[in-house]
A protein has these predicted regions:
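C-terminal output helix
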Residues: 116-125
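Acidic catalytic/metal-coordinating carboxylates
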Residues: 39, 65-71
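Acidic, metal-coordinating helix/loop segments flanking the phosphotransfer/catalytic sites
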Residues: 36-54
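As written
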Residues: 103-109
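Two-component/phosphorelay signaling modules centered on CheY-like receiver
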Residues: 16-35
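Conserved acidic carboxylate
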Residues: 13
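The feature encodes the CheY-like receiver
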Residues: 62, 96
Length: 130
């Protein structure tokens, strides 16, 4: 039986501490591969380079918002087609308020409040791929 590639999660976050913590969390989550991007531009490059299963996006990046990143992907016909079926999760420590609706309208599948604990992340990721 051929080896199957692990589902890839792209985590887009500009806070170095959060990046390090997420790397540690994914060491505890077998069955997943993690890739990191610190800016929207890095995320766009990563998405164009390799098939991704889930994109976790902080809403406040240094070069664009998470909403803008999602909209840019949707506006690029080739990239959007290549990413058909990818699950998008908006992440923020801010009170969601109207941002949840804006995230859904931009194409996000869900909105998770930070900080995210390990069981929440694990069950959320599994639910997305079921």
């Amino acid at each position: 039986m051929p080896d199957r590639a692990l589902p890839l999660v792209l985590y887009v976050e500009d806070d170095r501490i959060h990046l390090i913590l997420m790397e540690e969390v994914f060491r505890l989550l077998p069955g997943w591969e993690l890739r990191l991007a610190e800016t929207g531009a890095e995320a766009l490059a990563a998405l164009a380079e390799r098939r991704t299963a889930v994109v976790l996006v902080d809403m406040n990046l240094p070069d664009m918002t998470g909403l803008e990143l999602r909209r840019r992907v949707s506006a690029d016909a080739g990239l959007s087609a290549a990413l058909q079926g990818v699950r998008w999760i908006a992440l923020s420590a801010d009170d969601p308020g109207a941002l949840v609706r804006a995230a859904r309208e931009a194409g996000f599948d869900d909105y998770w409040l930070k900080p995210i604990d390990v069981p929440q992340l694990q069950s959320g990721l599994q639910r997305l791929l079921d």
